[in-house]
């Protein structure tokens, strides 16, 4: 679907919400990209920022799920020594990877050219740097060799920069700070295979938030406690995995 040239910021916003309701997330991405580029150096509102995140999260989410399914079928076919099918599956996987790369490149360009430079508040800086880390992490999930190494390094840089600002400017119970700790710890566990570091990061974020629970505002209570639950779920899973590995060793 070609976008009309002269859409206003309000029209882009309305159409993005419409596309979200219709679950047409690729178009939602286009409307939000157009909104960002059209607004130049002026900052996004919290609503606009969240819509941009939702749009890309849905598009990348279905592609990541597709990649995981295709990869597991590829392993099964290799196990069966079915060479003809393996060739077809590999080719199909590379098409999905090409789409993943394009989506990541799209949001990373928007973040670097528009959103990160224009962010003034600590909260929005952390939000965008976390997002940058997330999309480099999604690249690291399927890239191999040097490309994987570079994607992992870029993920680390973005998450570290976000963490520095989050610790200095956001409360331990702030949902964006908690979400960053959640994703950063997943990066340590899944991409760097550093399970102890992943556990200590998740545990620290959880405990710091628990200590300040009584100071939490109504508006973020639900978001924060949901992320805290996810941190605790990961900790439970990771520590039992580590215990199993130690038992096997």
UniProtKB/Swiss-Prot annotation:
<dbReference type="GO" id="GO:0008104">
    <property type="term" value="P:protein localization"/>
</dbReference>
<comment type="subunit">
    <text>Homodimer.</text>
</comment>
<dbReference type="GO" id="GO:0005737">
    <property type="term" value="C:cytoplasm"/>
</dbReference>
<dbReference type="InterPro" id="IPR023409">
    <property type="entry name" value="14-3-3_CS"/>
</dbReference>
<dbReference type="InterPro" id="IPR000308">
    <property type="entry name" value="14-3-3"/>
</dbReference>
<dbReference type="InterPro" id="IPR036815">
    <property type="entry name" value="14-3-3_dom_sf"/>
</dbReference>
<dbReference type="GO" id="GO:0007165">
    <property type="term" value="P:signal transduction"/>
</dbReference>
<protein>
    <recommendedName>
        <fullName>14-3-3 protein 1</fullName>
    </recommendedName>
</protein>
<dbReference type="Pfam" id="PF00244">
    <property type="entry name" value="14-3-3"/>
</dbReference>
<dbReference type="InterPro" id="IPR023410">
    <property type="entry name" value="14-3-3_domain"/>
</dbReference>
<comment type="similarity">
    <text>Belongs to the 14-3-3 family.</text>
</comment>
């Amino acid at each position: 679907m070609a976008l009309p040239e002269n859409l206003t910021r309000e029209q882009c916003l309305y159409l993005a919400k419409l596309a979200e309701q219709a679950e047409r997330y690729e178009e939602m991405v286009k409307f939000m990209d157009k909104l960002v580029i059209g607004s130049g150096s002026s900052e996004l509102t919290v609503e606009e920022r969240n819509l941009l995140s939702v749009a890309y999260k849905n598009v990348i989410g279905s592609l990541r799920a597709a990649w995981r399914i295709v990869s597991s079928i590829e392993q099964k076919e290799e196990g069966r020594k079915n060479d003809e099918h393996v060739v077809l599956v590999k080719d199909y996987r590379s098409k999905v990877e090409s789409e993943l790369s394009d989506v990541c490149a799209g949001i990373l360009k928007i973040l670097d050219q528009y959103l990160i430079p224009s962010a003034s508040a600590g909260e929005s800086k952390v939000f965008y740097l976390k997002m940058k880390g997330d999309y480099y992490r999604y690249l690291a999930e399927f890239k191999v060799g040097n490309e994987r190494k570079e994607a992992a390094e870029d993920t680390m840089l973005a998450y570290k920069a976000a963490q520095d600002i989050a610790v200095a400017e956001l409360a331990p119970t702030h949902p964006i700070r908690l979400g960053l700790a959640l994703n950063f710890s997943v990066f340590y566990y899944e991409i760097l295979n550093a399970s102890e570091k992943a556990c200590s990061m998740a545990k620290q974020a959880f405990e710091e938030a628990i200590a300040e629970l009584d100071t939490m505002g109504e508006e973020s209570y639900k978001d924060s406690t949901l992320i805290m639950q996810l941190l605790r779920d990961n900790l439970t899973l990771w520590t039992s995995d580590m215990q199993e590995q130690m038992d096997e060793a």
